[in-house]
Amino acid sequence: MMKKRVKRVLFKISGEALSDGDSSNRISEERLSRLIAELKVVRNADVEVALVIGGGNILRGLSQSQSLQINRVSADQMGMLATLINGMALADALKTEDVPNLLTSTLSCPQLAELYNPQKASDALSQGKVVICTMGAGAPYLTTDTGAALRACELKVDVLLKATMHVDGVYDQDPRECADAVRYDHISYRDFLSQGLGAIDPAAISLCMEAGIPIKMFSFARHSLEEAVFNTVGTVISSTEGGQL
């Protein structure tokens, strides 16, 4: 169990968490309902909740750039738009469940979302609203991980929780390719960077290291958001011995 009282968290949720894998069903009703229900549980535990949503269920900028010969900048911008689509779905679903929320965009889309402002977002969190951050870092060549780390620093969260669908933490090798890969329960920021581990963008690690914000990477396929916040699951990346948050 975490020893530190967790008051404010930021989830980085992959777009794949909203998809059931069917190419014709980019946003699954079942997956969306599960995510909304679990966000409600965490919020009802008196935790302030922000989240950064990916767009990989709709489009991956780098992959599209390579496969369709689209300019990298344009492809990344298309990927950012995909995160806004997912964010709009989340905002409406939360509203349907009477969960107050603020949908924000790093880039200006005034008819669709409020332009992200750190102070307004922080105030909304203090008021009990779920803050949804879309458009990643707002610039090409920067990953959604980096965008999540930026938001985590600006909002002064207690922990950044990265939910994935394929692995349950940070390994010394890719567990999908190496059967003898070993998962870390805890690893320091510096060891993560020096070993060149690829589970999280190194720019995101560096930002969180400077701000002293621990990162927990866990499997959303195996664990609930509540478990990720309050229990010992996945891998903790921090400077604290033993990974206690």
UniProtKB/Swiss-Prot annotation:
Protein name per UniProt:
Uridylate kinase
Cite the InterPro entries for this sequence.
AceGlu_kinase-like_sf, Asp/Glu/Uridylate_kinase, Uridylate_kinase, Uridylate_kinase_bac
> Which species does this protein come from?
Chlamydia trachomatis serovar D (strain ATCC VR-885 / DSM 19411 / UW-3/Cx)
Q: Which PANTHER family match?
A: URIDYLATE KINASE (PTHR42833), URIDYLATE KINASE PUMPKIN, CHLOROPLASTIC (PTHR42833:SF4)
GO molecular function of the protein, one example?
ATP binding
Residue positions annotated to bind ATP are: K12, I13, S14, G15, G56, R60, T164, Y171, D174
Record carries keyword Kinase: yes
**Which Gene3D superfamilies would you find in this protein's record?**
Acetylglutamate kinase-like
State where it is primarily located: cytoplasm
Q: How does it assemble?
A: Homohexamer.
